[in-house]
Amino acid sequence: MRTIAVIGKNFGDEGKGFACSRLASSLKNALIIKHNGGGQAGHTVEDPEGKWRFIHHQIGAGAEYHVPTLFADSFMPDLFQLGKEVKEFTEFFGFKPILYSEKNARVTTVEDVLLNMGAEVARGKNRHGSCGMGIEECVQRNAAGYGITVEGLVTWTKQDLLDRLKQIRKEYTERRAKILGIYPSNPYYEMLYNETVLENFVVEVKENVKLLTLVDVDRKWLEEFQNLIFETGQGLLLDQDYEAYAPHLTSSKTGIHNPTIFLEKRGLSLEEAIYVTRPYVTRHGNGPLPSEVKRSELPGVGEDLTNQPNEWQGILRYARHKSLKDFFEPVLRDRDSLNDLDRKEQIKTKESPEIIETTDAVETTETTEHIVVTKRSTRPGFSKLPKLFIFITQLSETENQLYFDKGNIPFESLQKAGEELGIQCISDTEWR
């Protein structure tokens, strides 16, 4: 069984949908696993010949090739929105997507979304740049003990679900709204007290949960597939624990953390991690963007058809890559995060096996800067390091150049720098 994680290297919008779809179309008997975030993803897939274009939110990018999607327990599906996406997909491709879900996947509710949007409005000029899809509020509600799972939606009656939602509203939502500064003047305040909103939500999600097949995802079930593709939302620089860009982050793990845990629970390991980036950097929403420029300052870069201006995300912003060191650093940091998993497991099991430490340092071929790879600790037989790839999309826009602060770098030069770090850089032209 081949296990692959597709991950955004920067702030998202790098081309993860394209990467997942290409893998799904070329690998036999594959399964796409959604493992972080929820309905806020927007992964665009275009036919290689330009005949069609579809934006995936919760349906895996690659489902158009009859590849099934699994919602892992770390994914937070928005079943209110899922019905619309499945309808659009079915009308577009002529068949329904195959959707599986782990039973304990946490469900995003309508009040999570309303609290999220209300909070962003209340923040005014200090918005976090949220997509307004309720992910942070889903996390907070579950942490407070008011969770609703996919299995709950299946087993409860409509009245059971409505009663549960009313309980959450009374015991949690009203208090949470005050904490977030959502008052009567807020346009979302009234809906947080409107019972019809809950009733409509119940009707919709009870119908849409029928689109999912609940499964016990053990190793035997996974072995029915030859290839596992972990489709990751957002990007490494938005990871919930990457404090350099706080509070403008997402409420999920955006790297190899979730796939590694998912696989190790079942006695498997992650074999490949593919980090996706454009030749330049993009970001939507509020928050820092180093080396930011206007799109017109990036030769050849055209308008992005997916990330159109909207109330929550604003306009898509552009930047040059800061330096080669900064280009590779997020990938190396994500790889080294496996050390934290090892240490936590070591504490959990009260074991103290031998630690093997290695330090790597290389000097780049294109600049005088020195890239120092952080110290790595690996234990034999645990958290095997995956092969690392950086997949560069949109190179046709930039004539095979990557845009950096101190000048453009040819793709071939980037490949050489990556090889010295144990990272293989590949271009989208190789996959078309």
Enumerate the language-model features and the residues they cover.
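Acidic, glycine-centered low-complexity repeats within long intrinsically disordered regions
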Residues: 354-369
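Non-transmembrane, aqueous-exposed alpha-helical and coiled segments at domain scale
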Residues: 1-348, 374-432
